[in-house]
Amino acid sequence: MGMNTGLVIAGVAGATALAISAAAIPFVAPALRRVCIPYVPATTEQLANVSRALSLATSSNSNKKGTLIDLGSGDGRVVLQCAREGFNSTGVELNSILVAYSKYRSIREGLGKETRFMRKNIFKTDLNPYQTAVIFGAESLMGDLVPKLSEMRSNTNLLACRFPLPENDAWKLEHQIGEGIDAVWVYKRN
């Protein structure tokens, strides 16, 4: 093996390591934030519970096909499912790779007009235009989220998945669907 072959192998190995590191950064970076919210895809049971929760939350509305935002939308599966159920759905996610993947899936599944995905911090997102919000949060995040969620208008809905909101005056618990990690709490804004 000549000197040039060794340099080529070393260059390829270095470029591969750099590419893997660059691809991993959006998935590792959440661990470095004040509140760690790792990407964990929603399970089939969680998606079914979200669907049941949406039915309960919107059953009193004459127009079930309102606007919905998923705060921390990950790979977009909740946004896509909600769009299939007739909601004009938006996903907000910090991980640029997951945002790109969500946009790709949306187009591939023919839901590009019913969905929108943004790379944005949930705490810097205007929630006022939305009738329903979905959050798969971490327990440590839920208390910090209550003041942000107060931007939503009265009589709007919140689906908190995996962890409930702490007791507060702004949101009234209406239903709990499922148990444990698959649980969904349905709240109505006072």
From Swiss-Prot:
InterPro entries: FAM173A/B, SAM-dependent_MTases_sf. GO terms for molecular function: protein-lysine N-methyltransferase activity. Its EC number is 2.1.1.-. It comes from the Eukaryota. SUPFAM superfamilies: S-adenosyl-L-methionine-dependent methyltransferases. It is an enzyme of class 2 (transferase). It catalyses: L-lysyl-[protein] + 3 S-adenosyl-L-methionine = N(6),N(6),N(6)-trimethyl-L-lysyl-[protein] + 3 S-adenosyl-L-homocysteine + 3 H(+). Its main location: mitochondrion. Keywords: Methyltransferase, Mitochondrion, S-adenosyl-L-methionine, Transferase. GO terms for cellular component: mitochondrion. Mitochondrial protein-lysine N-methyltransferase that trimethylates ATP synthase subunit C. Trimethylation is required for proper incorporation of the C subunit into the ATP synthase complex and mitochondrial respiration. Belongs to the ANT/ATPSC lysine N-methyltransferase family. This is ATP synthase subunit C lysine N-methyltransferase. It comes from Caenorhabditis elegans.
